[in-house]
Amino acid sequence: MHIGLFYNAYCTESLSKIVSIGTAVPAYCHQQMDILQFMQQVYAATEADKRKMRFLYHQSGIEQRYSVIPDYSKEIQDWKFYPQSESLEPFPTLELRMTMYSKHAPLLSVDAIRDCLNHAHHPKNITHLITVSCTGMSAPGLDLQVMELMDLKKSIFRTSVNFMGCYAAVHALKIADAICKAEKKAQVLIVCTELCTLHFQRENTIDNITASLLFGDGSAAVLMTADDNELPGLHLDNFYSEVIPKGKRDMAWELSSSGFIMTLSGYIPELIEQDFSGILQRALAKENSDFDDVTDWCIHPGGKRILEAIHKSLQFANGQLSYSYEVLKEFGNLSSASILFVLKKMLYTKKEMRKLVGAAFGPGLTVETFTAHC
């Protein structure tokens, strides 16, 4: 995007707003305890391993997750993605995983977009398209596939936010905010689609076990316009991003021949507990606000321990992160789509939010925040 677009956007007092959010999940809903049984076959060599995994799954705060893969609650003879062998060999390759991504991600994206537009907004009126994903990529990519399936204008402005991880939705909102401020008639469509369950790995490591108990598949779409559009919505006030360098090795996402490899250390909740409060103070200071002004919290449900760390960091009373806990319980961690699932729940159940703070975390360790009101 041209630097002048951002300069012009942030030299104005106008706001952008979210006018609609849609979500979609794949067909296969797996109970957390069914996934546990599958993963015990993968990781548990001994009864002690099984007991440890059972404890972790029971403590996860997750009841179910969705996947494009049916195998996680099927008997071995009914597996479709993994080899029907106790050794799981030959283990699915990166090529097979990307084939599955290319098959399912565009269709799931379209389901979320249709839920977002909900017959009230015509696809031909969309001027800008931003696709977000860290679980698959190709060229031509998700942006062109969505454009074709939704019959969007061939001249549409499009861009992609790739491989940024769980905070990428906030980054996309920031890009859309700049567009809407610079172009008053813009209608910006964001779609975040993550097929995390394609990338579960074979090696018995704590990172792989943690990823296998946390992540699910899902898609979320957002329609944004300039503030003077007549449609009601959530007005976006400000954005703030900060990196915690000491956590750069504690959360990572890398390519390998067998898929994408997750690094997710147990130190992350401690880092967030130590640093999150200060980051939010600096974010709120941009608009001369403080914690007392905040009425609502939209926090990425990265995991139960992360939400507990935020509770401690901000000295919350019980219930202030209830929407985040609900999304974690119903869907697991959906990477970039998660925070939009939380925001949708809030928008559809709360009539007024005088000061909302949203935050998501990802590799870096990066914290992306935004403030909003309606």
Residue spans for each PLM region:
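Glycine/charged-rich beta-loop-alpha catalytic/anionic-binding loops adjacent to active sites
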Residues: 92-93, 124-128, 149-162, 202-207, ...
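Short, well-ordered amphipathic alpha-helical segments that serve as non-catalytic structural scaffolds
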Residues: 58, 62, 104-118, 175, ...
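Condensing-enzyme catalytic core mediating Claisen C-C bond formation in acyl metabolism
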Residues: 2-100, 187, 196, 200-274, ...
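Conserved beta-ketoacyl condensing-enzyme motif
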Residues: 56, 60-152, 291-307
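Short coil/turn connectors at secondary-structure junctions
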Residues: 13-16, 123-127, 154-157, 183-188, ...
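Claisen-condensing/thiolase-fold acyl-transfer catalytic domains that form or cleave C-C bonds
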Residues: 2, 10, 110, 134-135, ...
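Acidic-glycine-rich active-site phosphate/pyrophosphate-binding loop
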Residues: 137-152, 190-201, 249-253, 307-321
